Amino acid sequence: MQKSVRYNEGHALYLAFLARKEGTKRGFLSKKTAEASRWHEKWFALYQNVLFYFEGEQSCRPAGMYLLEGCSCERTPAPPRAGAGQGGVRDALDKQYYFTVLFGHEGQKPLELRCEEEQDGKEWMEAIHQASYADILIEREVLMQKYIHLVQIVETEKIAANQLRHQLEDQDTEIERLKSEIIALNKTKERMRPYQSNQEDEDPDIKKIKKVQSFMRGWLCRRKWKTIVQDYICSPHAESMRKRNQIVFTMVEAESEYVHQLYILVNGFLRPLRMAASSKKPPISHDDVSSIFLNSETIMFLHEIFHQGLKARIANWPTLILADLFDILLPMLNIYQEFVRNHQYSLQVLANCKQNRDFDKLLKQYEANPACEGRMLETFLTYPMFQIPRYIITLHELLAHTPHEHVERKSLEFAKSKLEELSRVMHDEVSDTENIRKNLAIERMIVEGCDILLDTSQTFIRQGSLIQVPSVERGKLSKVRLGSLSLKKEGERQCFLFTKHFLICTRSSGGKLHLLKTGGVLSLIDCTLIEEPDASDDDSKGSGQVFGHLDFKIVVEPPDAAAFTVVLLAPSRQEKAAWMSDISQCVDNIRCNGLMTIVFEENSKVTVPHMIKSDARLHKDDTDICFSKTLNSCKVPQIRYASVERLLERLTDLRFLSIDFLNTFLHTYRIFTTAAVVLGKLSDIYKRPFTSIPVRSLELFFATSQNNRGEHLVDGKSPRLCRKFSSPPPLAVSRTSSPVRARKLSLTSPLNSKIGALDLTTSSSPTTTTQSPAASPPPHTGQIPLDLSRGLSSPEQSPGTVEENVDNPRVDLCNKLKRSIQKAVLESAPADRAGVESSPAADTTELSPCRSPSTPRHLRYRQPGGQTADNAHCSVSPASAFAIATAAAGHGSPPGFNNTERTCDKEFIIRRTATNRVLNVLRHWVSKHAQDFELNNELKMNVLNLLEEVLRDPDLLPQERKAAANILRALSQDDQDDIHLKLEDIIQMTDCMKAECFESLSAMELAEQITLLDHVIFRSIPYEEFLGQGWMKLDKNERTPYIMKTSQHFNDMSNLVASQIMNYADVSSRANAIEKWVAVADICRCLHNYNGVLEITSALNRSAIYRLKKTWAKVSKQTKALMDKLQKTVSSEGRFKNLRETLKNCNPPAVPYLGMYLTDLAFIEEGTPNFTEEGLVNFSKMRMISHIIREIRQFQQTSYRIDHQPKVAQYLLDKDLIIDEDTLYELSLKIEPRLPA
């Protein structure tokens, strides 16, 4: 039998004695017994963290005691009472206060207590809550930290006091010396002073003259002193000091806000999640909590101390000494470094934890706290990443207004240099985790949730509004008109493109997103993209005329469900081209990489993942490149820093092309290079692919077994694989060895019942078939001859040749080759002909399961049905042709292939792949950045010349020819933006119009035309003006004319609103004008024109109008409440957090406030340089800039459908109605003079 636990009973009785006399809380409570479930009244005494209970108040010996360490206390409802005849007793019991003490150990029964008064119960609960030794330790630690800080401050003050004492002593000595000098001078003057007559003998006129002179001297001195003071006030030094003080005040406000954000992070998330991790069924482990919130609490304590120091410095204003505060902050930077290095892992752990529904539900409860103001946890985790760059900007501004001889200058410069070192790391981490935070933000907007966005390898590409066209059976489009309002309203979809999936959502009135029940999440690997449905689908022929060639089709063939079609309508051709480029590139990244993997796995000892891993240039840092831990959409580490040459090399690396790298490069290339250099690199890749591609890439591109013997003796890690192409193949290809040979392949259908694949055999004629020994086709087999003369360059091989070498081990390679070609060209066959020539039993649904998931079906091209079997050729896509050629060159050649022919095969692969890459990059460039070619005619002509040269290539594949022709047509056609209204057109139309008065215009008319003007000006800003912070330079009008025009228009509109209000002489008219303008601002909000809202609210907040108390007294309460709501929406608080959230929850068209994005760009530009000290491009910074430009262009590309009204526009653009700021204030003083002090 186990012995009972022994304890020091004598000491326990002594503690009970102390509890009866000095206990924290004492009194009678009713205790529920565990055996009979009855209540007994006991006298309880709480001493520290031990609860004693006695039989009565006079009892000396306790009846029992409870250890309260690690327990919790909570109120419980009154237990139900049985019995109908005891109503009075039950009511009395229900009025009592019940609470329970819960112990952490499982199986430990809780202590149930009750008391008669609620106040007494609350006091008992509060006392039990505070009876924790662990909490006292935490408080003690906090106090110790504060004590250490105060000791440091006291020591600093002692040193300062000692210095002041020495200064006072020196000054006393100086005063004594000066006094002695004065005495000596006075004695000298007395000796030199001549005899003076008595003052009484002085003439009265002389006395008056002296008084006047004395008065004049005093007046001149005061005038001179006033001039000196005014000169100093207007001097650059005083202006600098004023700006410096303003910077410090702003810094204190920002620090206060930041400390509040950290407080919410710690108290609203960290501590509650720690408690949840200690529960019986924890939704999250303690390790995960520590990983997510590493050093968060310490950072909060650090900044609380820093904030208190700032406030103490402000109390000593106008003397502001800040350098010692930063000296306190600098030693703590290692804490920040740990937080920064953990940031990406933190967000990845958070994304993984969100897959747990219990944790996700709990997190949503925490985020619903009003203190969070709708912000998510990952937002709070990112705030510390922005704080150090904000300090750097503040120090830059302080140093700009701090004289060189200032006592603080060296200290501030040292602090800035230390912070900049950490800031570079922070910007890199923020850039690397931008994608995870974007995915989590979108996932939180979707009401149903979306688990695929919790995959941290998923990369966001683009979003926008598209119209989903309803369809009926067999994919026939409903007869709807493009201008149908019902179609736009009911069919509008918010679409999100990721590297692996395509999301289609509807947006509710509250701004939340809902995934479509059918086809809401499309896996791109199951999708076929048809860019011109009228050209590829007979059922939808003529839809191009109905929809103006703005529609495109996505055919989805999921492996476990029936196929279906999604038809989407873009708002413009340029928008459609951009969507097409991105979707096709994402599908390429998935399928072509998978296709290359299959081909190399079947025909080589080196697979594509190993091929990429074995290339150290793709993942190991070097003198001219540095990588981050994050992988891009092609599973290759993202570039953090790189030279221009390495960036161009990555752009033209034929093994892969990451869509996120391509978009970032095209957005920001003009920061570190020119369009001519980029085009020159593309031209070199096309004309001289072997000399333009690094030798190492070529070696790994063809890293396969060299011969039959090598296949059995050399493994994938042999150095021979790396030495195979130590020098590039010859560039010149003679016509005799040209890969244009009469060679055909027969595609056999239907499916073989055993292997589930189509039999593809080589033959010298369409009627001669060489059967595979592994599987022979059924008797009723239709064959589709495919002309692959441009895809393969091996000489013809007769059936006899294969039969003679049946016993040769190379037959296995040939069989692998045939299987690879089957997978590569399966979708390249004309679908209509395959259906005609195949067996009736083999329909499309039977063919779907055997399609290789890595086959690029989105580039499928169908020949017209009128062609015969003799002259019909398969139009192989570039990716398919590349796979076929790679499969052909990837293994040892059959007997009869000489070295020259093998070289031609490999050269053909490189040329076709290089052509495909050049066309792909040009397609993205032309479709997404048409302004580059509109503003640079020389660049446009060079691209046209290159495309014409590509089209003259006799070996060009049909699909490549079509792609080049499409790019050529896009460049040659007139500017598509001509259909849009421009500001110059509006001004020209309003020149001869008669001016309208404010009273004759309705609020709706004003709001619509303000929105139209704001959007026209905002849309006209070319993206290159957002680069390089040109709007802050001295030559800003030349470098960023459109941004300055937008800023000027904002100021003119704000001045117009203020001027119109001040034009009224009586109070009621001014109040009515204010109410009308507030109504205009509210309509602008409904139209998603937040720039217009800010134009009007900023005008109403001007001092000239805000001070008119009598006028505002006449304004209705409803208008004032609406004004407050609008101001809160566009407030700059928290980096425009409310405006950002509002923009996130609205569909374009919308007009954001441009200053918000310019602030973000300035923050990035000033935080980190474009180039490192080694001269490498800071590509992490380029990625952050690209994300902001992408968001701006999202709002630029969707236009409003508002009719232009010249009369209203003429009023809004009339400069004669605008009164300058000084005149406005003078007019305001005349209307309502200042009250006497």
From Swiss-Prot:
Residues 155-193 form a coiled coil. Residues 710-809, 829-873 are annotated as: Disordered. Residues 744-752 are annotated as: Regulates proteasomal degradation. GO terms for molecular function: calmodulin binding; guanyl-nucleotide exchange factor activity. Residues 791-800, 841-855 have a biased composition (Polar residues). The keyword Repeat applies. This is Ras-specific guanine nucleotide-releasing factor 2. It comes from Homo sapiens (Human).
